[in-house]
Regions:
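Short beta-edge strand/loop motif at the mouth of beta-sheet-based domains
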Residues: 9, 29-74, 167
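Residue-level recognition of conserved beta-strand positions in structured domain cores
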Residues: 53, 91, 125-127
């Protein structure tokens, strides 16, 4: 496979029913619980949504890594919501510099695609559009999100495996 600088792809096999996985990625409260964000409302296709980094409730070690960013804005533009199949949003990757206005920068597209398999649900996460990010931020944003999405795939697995977290 050719290494690309424009997109990140991560896959994880989740041992949970499709409806449960869908809820974990499409319900803003559940998503925020494992991802480490508190949103101001629900995910609605075509609508912007504001949030703030709060730290994951699933893994204390990852929560420690998120701690320096707690309270920072986490704003997205929800793109698509196709029940039990696809959820996508746009955001400004690695937009963590205090006082920096990222609104004029291009965004990347984050897509969660779900596919049922005999063993569970295959979640394929793709974030694309890094080649459009300003050069001075591009490599750092790509590297941070490459590692960040690896953590997030572990977090959603833990979230779904923990019966106490299930609503």
């Amino acid at each position: 496979m050719t290494k690309t600088t424009d997109s990140i792809e991560k896959k994880v096999l989740l041992h949970a029913p499709l409806s449960r996985v869908w809820r974990a990625i499409s319900d803003s409260s559940e998503f925020g619980s494992w991802f480490g964000v508190t949103f101001e409302g629900p995910f609605v296709a075509g609508a912007p949504l504001r949030g703030a980094i709060t730290g994951t409730k699933v893994d204390p070690e990852v929560a420690k890594l998120q701690k320096p960013h707690e309270g920072k804005p986490f704003n997205i533009q929800v793109e698509q919501m196709e029940p039990e199949r696809l959820f996508s949003f746009r955001w400004h990757p690695y937009a963590i510099e205090p006082g920096m206005d990222y609104s004029s920068e291009p965004t990347t597209l984050v897509t969660f695609q779900l596919d049922e398999t005999p063993e569970g649900v295959q979640l394929t996460l793709t974030e694309s559009g890094f080649d459009q990010i300003p050069l001075e931020r591009r490599a750092k944003a790509f590297a941070a999100n490459e590692g960040g999405w690896s953590h997030q795939m572990v977090l959603i697995s833990k979230y779904l495996a923990n019966a106490d977290q299930a609503h």
